[in-house]
Amino acid sequence: VRYDARRIPLRSAIVLTFVSIERFTTMTDRRSGDSGSILFAVTIFTSAFLLFQVQPLLAKFILPWFGGTPAVWTMCMLVFQMLLFGGYAYAHLLSRIGSNSRQALIHASLLTIAALTLPVVPAAEWKPTGDEAPGLRITLLLLATVGMPYFLLSSTGPLLQNWFSKACPGASPYRLYALSNIGSLLALISYPFVFEPLFSSTAQAWLWSVLFLIFALSCLMCSWKTAMAPATSGTGNEESPTTQTADDVPLPRVRWLILAMLPSIMLLATTNEVCMNIAVVPFLWIIPLTLYLLSFILTFESDRFYRRRPMILLTACSLCATMLMLSRGSMSGVVFQIALLLGNLFVVCMFCHGELVRLKPDPKQLTAFYLTMSAGGAAGGLAVGLLAPLVFKGYFELPLALVACLLICIGTFLRDDKQFQQRVPPRTTLNMGAVLLGLCFIYFTCFAQHAPDVLDVKRNFYGVLRVENDVLESNARPMRDMVHGCVVHGRQFVDQDGRYQPSTYYSQSSGIGRTLLTVDADRPRRIGVVGLGAGTLAVYGRSGDAIRFYEINPDVIDLARKHFTFLDDSHAEIDVIPGDARLVLDRETDQNFDVLVLDAFSGDAIPVHLLTSEAMRIYMRHLSDRGILAIHISNLYFDLEPVVRALAAESGLEARVQKCVQGSDGGVAFNSVWMLLSGDTSALNVACGPDASTAPHRVVYWTDDHNNLLNVLR
């Protein structure tokens, strides 16, 4: 993707930013008679930009350390939401202190402490060793690296809006909230198109740290201006026609909490669904988060973007369509599924945030309002990041959230009916919805997880695994599959002869099948395999061979031993090493592998950290002089051949591409593409078939510090 092609959305975002700041300051200066409003506008905008720029930055930084799983982003979002809640709580408590000068002094002191924790570059000591809980380690890593700066950035929005209402009496602070969301949106749009392709991860972290220092100085100026402002009894009185005070609304804080929590759940659940079988990359994290923020901008900017009755109808239709799509599963195309999921997320966020705006209080309760909203967002993060993996064995949080949103839609529609309002108290409506949602929760917990053909289901930090019984369509042979999401990671036929037959991506006609059948046939071999799956490659082991599997997911190891016999049936000596393969190989002494296999891709998701120059140096250290590196690059969405060819060229190896066609080997093979790399041409001549490709191809260099999947998008 050329930089010029990325200018248009970035230019539009920058224009929108300056227009919004100019519009806000012009209106505010006219009403308050104070020209200092631009300082508050720029400070809040900068804080929001930094707040959302650091999220993909740090998530990408640590992604290689924790196996490249979507759960890394979910845990990062959870930690950031909890810090956001902490920042809002701090702003709420600080605003209760009567003296403006005391508030300014406390905040200035904390800003100074935060500046001392820079830069936000994660220390190598935080890399996992393999025997700790990844979720806890990610939490501690983020708190140690960016906890204090992020906490203070989170507090900036509500705190400066409160200070602004004192320094510029007569002006509404709520437009500052829309302005902050524009800053957040610009951060998200600019990251994948500007900062990620142009700067290394370390350079991004240092640049962010410098911008934080500039923000801190600007914030100190705002605090000084507030300290100099005279004490006032009011905080501004401009209200939109739909604004209601807390006393006018039944159960106001419960509604604020629910309406903030549901979009948060939908955001994380939708992101999981989209990333699970495409790629764990900032670009795909950012699209849902951008839609989430855009709904905030539109609803808080003006009530003209939210029309209640049409939005209720649109939301109900969108929710029903998404439920139907999820029930049909793979019958819908991938592009259609993603478009519907993202469209539904935006509609739901518009509905929930539009209702939040209708219920917003006067500025006197501003910090309490934002605190409750952030509590709802944090509760949604906890529900998806911690509660759902403990309670559900599948990804049921999305359908459950869809049901909850539909109930809120119905309840909102009924509350507009005056006759219904007279007959049914608000608490009764809330209780009825809670009961129905509880019944759905029981269904997903107790019944939906037990399909008749599913032998076992496990869910952990790395995703959902299933072992299923099935039959081969061509000849009705009974078989057993290990499935991650909707992708088969290993298959074994259960009849006596078929249990020793390799299939799917590892059949005898595949690139890896040809290699393991022919290479060094006259002597014992040492074989390394990154990614266990069902253990299919163990069937290629001969007496005297040693096969060493590396597997990051402990549930994969458990299911492979429990439900498949490949490991037990192999004639080779088998070792299964738990932990991230790259980290384990980096710590191990040289293994002198004759063949090293990279097959750690979950569906079409790409663990980028396994295809960088730094990773390649580790593999080369463990290969024998005539060793072959076999890399599985089958993928619907990304062309990984340029990346692998770059690795081969950098290491002085020859690279060949071996393809296998669906239905080969008696109908048991899948379409597969393997790349074989070696410094010994004779070894490749033996391993590759006559159809292996050696055609020249463009190259794309990836390093740990600088890589971009947009460069290899098909």
State the predicted function of each range:
Residues 3, 11-12, 16-691, 697, ...:
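Alpha-helical transmembrane segments of multi-pass membrane proteins
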